[in-house]
Design a protein with these regions (language model features):
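Conserved pre-ATP/AMP-binding loop-to-beta segment of ANL
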Residues: 1-15, 22, 45-50
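Short Gly/Pro-enriched turn/cap motifs at secondary-structure boundaries
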Residues: 2-4, 182-191, 214-215, 245, ...
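Glycine-centered tight turns that cap/initiate beta-strands
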Residues: 9, 123, 148, 301-304
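Conserved ATP-binding/catalytic segment of the ANL
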Residues: 16, 206, 211-283, 289, ...
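Conserved AMP-binding/adenylation subdomain of ANL enzymes
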Residues: 34-51, 56-98, 113
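Gly/Ser/Thr-rich phosphate-binding loop
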Residues: 68, 98-101, 111-183, 196, ...
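C-terminal boundary motif of the adenylate-forming
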Residues: 209-211, 259-261, 298-325
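Short, conserved charged micro-motifs
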Residues: 327-330
């Protein structure tokens, strides 16, 4: 027997990853989950009867509401980069999987395997990946392993509001990828309807309310904020963090501050530049990790990089940490 619930009743407390701070419990109400199901269906064309490979367990919780069958692969979901791709391919082929939600690390493993072994997964028509920027070469490898009408989607959002925006492999032109490599940031696509997304002036302080004068024009980098049906309103028993993460417009509408720096381009596409808290504040202005690191990550022999700031904010010196390919300990 289903319990009779009301839209504003608390349905769950979902914790943030804690990758950039202390994990916080996000209060989800029934209306948030209902809106997420509707937005996922409409944004990605998910239909009842599909089969999902659950490499990311939290997304699998949506499968019954979306009418999808769940296939659980043999892997450690907390360490997606260590997944055995042969097991993933076997599960996809055995159960005719149509949908896969995986981290960028898992897609890199699976895409590389399919490329090296010339494997095509004819039933896999949709791949979703979130949690971090997905490299262009990873998207290309996965696209090659899918049927011609298959698409790789990279939704952008957070536990507090998901999905916020999305871009698919069909829209990832060579020009966009080149822009990322040249330091423009990562294009995360158009806002997912009916979300409203804006760019707020950068500040580390609480913003109780904002007006038009606090919003930035096209091309200017600020903090990404969003208001929509999946925008949650509080953290569990964390009043101070809630105050920092939420704001209201002149009409009293609630908005969530993503804590991410970004901007809109002339085509209305949203670009991610990096975490606001990880920006390097120099005497000449701010530097954003995703923009800077992408330039150096494209250099042959470089595995990954990390931009950090040394010194007091406003006078920091930028330092780039570089990890090279195939470094072996001796």
């Amino acid at each position: 027997v289903l319990v009779d619930t009301r839209p504003d009743e608390t349905a769950a407390i979902l914790f943030t990853s804690g990758s950039t701070g202390i994990p916080k419990g996000v209060v989800y109400r029934h209306r948030h989950f209902a809106a997420q199901v509707d937005m996922l269906k409409n944004a990605f064309g998910i239909r009842p009867g599909e089969v999902d490979l659950a490499t990311f367990p939290p997304f699998a919780l949506f499968d019954p509401a979306l009418g999808m069958t769940t296939v659980v692969p043999y892997m450690d979901p907390t360490r997606p980069a260590t997944a055995n791709p042969t097991y993933l391919v076997q599960a996809i082929e055995q159960f005719s999987v149509t949908n896969l939600f995986g981290s960028p690390a898992l897609l890199k493993v699976l895409g590389k395997y399919c490329t090296e072994h010339a494997r095509v997964l004819p039933t896999l028509k949709r791949v979703l990946s979130a949690g971090a920027a997905v490299p262009g070469d990873t998207i290309a490898m996965m696209q090659k392993a899918m049927p011609k009408d298959g698409l790789v989607h990279t939704p952008y959002g957070a536990t507090e509001c998901l999905p916020l925006a999305c871009i698919s492999s069909a829209d990832m032109s060579p020009e966009l990828l080149a822009a990322t490599r040249s330091g423009k940031g990562t294009c995360v696509g158009q806002p997912v309807a009916p979300n409203r997304v804006a760019i707020l002036r950068l500040t580390d302080e609480a913003v109780e309310t904002f007006g038009p004068e606090d919003l930035l024009a096209t091309g200017a980098i600020g903090e990404i904020i969003v208001s929509g049906p999946t925008t949650t309103d509080s953290y569990w028993q964390r009043t101070a963090q809630t105050r920092l993460a939420k704001t209201r417009d002149p009409d009293g509408q609630l908005w969530h501050r993503m804590g991410d720096a970004g901007y809109f381009d002339a085509q209305g596409r949203l670009w991610f530049c990096g975490r606001k808290s990880q920006r390097v504040q120099t005497a000449l202005g701010d530097l954003f990790a995703d923009q800077i690191e992408a330039v150096f990550n494209g250099i042959e022999g470089v595995e990954r990089t990390a931009l950090v700031g040394v010194g007091a904010p406003g006078q920091q010196e930028p330092v780039l940490c570089i990890e090279l390919h195939n470094i072996k300990s001796t």
